[in-house]
Amino acid sequence: MKITINNRYMALQGLFWMLFCVSSGFISLYLQGRGLGNAEIGTVTAFFGILAALLQPLLGGITDRSSRLTWRNMILMLAIPYLVICIVMPFVPGAWAGAVFMGLLILLGNTMMPFINSANFYYSYAGEYINFGVARGIGSGLYALLALVIGVLAEKFGVEMVPISGILIALLFILVVFRMPSTKEPVEKAPRVKGLEKGFLLRYPAFTLMLLACLLMLTTHNILNTYLLQIIQSLGGNSSQLGIALAIQAVVEVPVLFGFTKLLKRFRPRTLMLTAAIGFALKALMYALSSSVFMIYLIQVTQMISFALFASASVFYTSEAIAKKDQTTGQAYMTSMMAAGTVLGSLSGGWILELSGMKAMLSVNVIIALLGVCFAFMSVRNIGLRRKV
C-alpha cells in the first residue's frame, strides 16, 4: 500500500498534538508535583509563552524570505531539542529545574505550530491533496488517547511519566518529519516588498481585529486548560480525572475536525471564527457554574463549538485573509496568539487563583471570553477593510 503525502501529514499532525499534550496538557500536574504553587506555575508558563509569541512571527518571516530555510527544516530544529529535554528531565531534580525544562517544552511546541500548519499549504499549493480537517482530527484523537494514558501513569508512577512519554512521541515525530517528501513543484518564494514586515498588521486591519479576538479566546481557553487540575481538585478530583477530562475535550473535537471540509462548503471561515468565539464564551460561563467533576466532563462537550472550530477555522481564515506571499508570516501571527493567550491565561489565572480563589478566576474568565466575542464581531463586520500600500 502506497503511503501518500496526505497520510504522512496526518501522522505529522497526530504526533505533533501528542507532543503538545505532553507539555501544555500536563504542565500544572508536573510542576505541582515538583513543588510549585499556582502563581509560580502561571509565571513560568507566561514567561515561556512570551518567548514563543515573539519567536513565532520572527521565524515565520525569516522562513518566508529564505530559499533555504523550509518549514521542514524549522520543525527539525525545534523537535530535536524537545527530544533531548525529555530525555534529561527525569534525571535532574528540583522544582525550578523542572519549571525551566517544562517551559522549554512549551516554547518549542508552540513555536513549531505555524510550520505544521504551513506544511498543509506548501503541499496544497504544489498540487498535492491534503485533508487538513481529518489530519487535525487525528491530532485530537491521539491527544485524547495520550491524555488518558499519562493521567493513569502519573497517578500510579508519578509525574516523571510526563517527560518519559514525551521521549517516545518525539522520536516518532522526528522520524515522520524526516520522511516528509519534497514536492515536485516547490512553492516559489514570493518577492518581498521593503518594509513589508513593519506594515503587516496595518495592511490587514480586519485580520488584526481577529487576532485580538483570538488572543482573548485563547486566554480564556488557557485559563481553563492550565488550571483544569486545580478546578478538578477543588471539586474533589485527581490526576486520573484530569486525564479523563482532557481526553473528553479532545475526543469531541474529532467529528468537527473530520467534517470541517463540509462546514467550509456552507460557511465562510470568518463566520466559523465568530461561532468559535461564542462557543468559548459559553464554555467559560458553564465552568463558572460547575459544581462537580461530572459537570466538568459534560461541559467538555462545548469544545466542539469552541476550540475544535477555532483549530481549523483559524488556519483557513488566515489563508483567506492574507496574501499568498505573506502566508507563513500570517500563520505565525495567528499561532503566536496561542502563545500570547498562554501568557495571559496562565499569568492572570495563576495570580487570581492565588489571591482571590477559584470563583474569582472563573468569573474573570467569563468577562474575557465575552470581550473575545466583541472583537470577533467587529472583525467580521470590517472584513472588507484594507489599507492601500
Kindly give the residue locations of the regions a language model identified:
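Helix-loop boundary and gating motifs at the non-cytosolic
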Residues: K2-G49, A206-A245
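Helix-to-loop junctions at the C-terminal end of transmembrane segments
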Residues: L55-R68, A154, V256-R268, L353-E354
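Cytoplasmic helix-loop-helix junction between adjacent transmembrane helices
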Residues: G103-I138
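Structural signature of the two symmetry-related core transmembrane helices
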Residues: N73-I87, T271-M286, V366
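Loop-to-transmembrane helix entry/capping segments in MFS-fold secondary transporters
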Residues: N38-A39, A126-I138, S239-S240, I322-M334
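Juxtamembrane intracellular "pre-TM" segments in multi-pass secondary transporters
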Residues: M1-I3, M180-L212
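Symmetry-related core transmembrane helices of the 12-TM Major Facilitator Superfamily/SLC fold
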Residues: V162-F178, M361-S379
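Hydrophobic core of transmembrane alpha-helices in multi-pass small-molecule transporters
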Residues: G14, A95-M113, L215, M295-L309
